[in-house]
């Protein structure tokens, strides 16, 4: 899968750049709320009230942004341009 089609990176990068609030639910049901400071292939750094949490992606169940994030993949670009 190419970087252009990586939906999770698109969502996290847009949330980081736009400083959007996210709610991240862990597999055990615990919700974490905050803003994405940084992320890589395995982790997300989340900031809330001047505290940072390093969250491992394998522990995440769901990510819910505070507002809709428009994601574009090669398929949707082709459909729009097509």
Swiss-Prot record:
Family to which the UniProt record says this protein belongs: Belongs to the Hfq family.
PROSITE patterns: SM
UniProt entry keywords in alphabetical sequence: RNA-binding, Stress response
GO molecular function: RNA binding
Identification of the protein by name: RNA-binding protein Hfq
Quaternary structure, from the entry: Homohexamer.
Species in which this protein is naturally found: Leptospira borgpetersenii serovar Hardjo-bovis (strain JB197)
Pfam family of the protein (one): Hfq
Gene that encodes the chain: hfq
Gene Ontology terms describing biological process: regulation of DNA-templated transcription; regulation of RNA stability; regulation of translation, ncRNA-mediated
Any one GO cellular component localisation term in the record: cytosol
Protein role: RNA chaperone that binds small regulatory RNA (sRNAs) and mRNAs to facilitate mRNA translational regulation in response to envelope stress, environmental stress and changes in metabolite concentrations. Also binds with high specificity to tRNAs.
Domain Sm: 9-69
PANTHER family linked: RNA-BINDING PROTEIN HFQ (PTHR34772:SF1)
């Amino acid at each position: 899968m190419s970087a252009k089609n990586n939906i999770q990176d698109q969502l996290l990068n847009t949330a980081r750049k736009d400083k959007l609030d996210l709610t991240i639910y862990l597999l055990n049901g615990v919700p974490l709320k905050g803003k994405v400071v940084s992320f890589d292939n395995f982790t997300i750094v989340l900031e809330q009230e001047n505290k940072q949490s390093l969250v491992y992606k394998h522990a995440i169940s769901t990510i819910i942004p505070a507002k809709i994030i428009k994601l574009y993949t090669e398929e949707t670009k082709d459909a729009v341009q097509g």
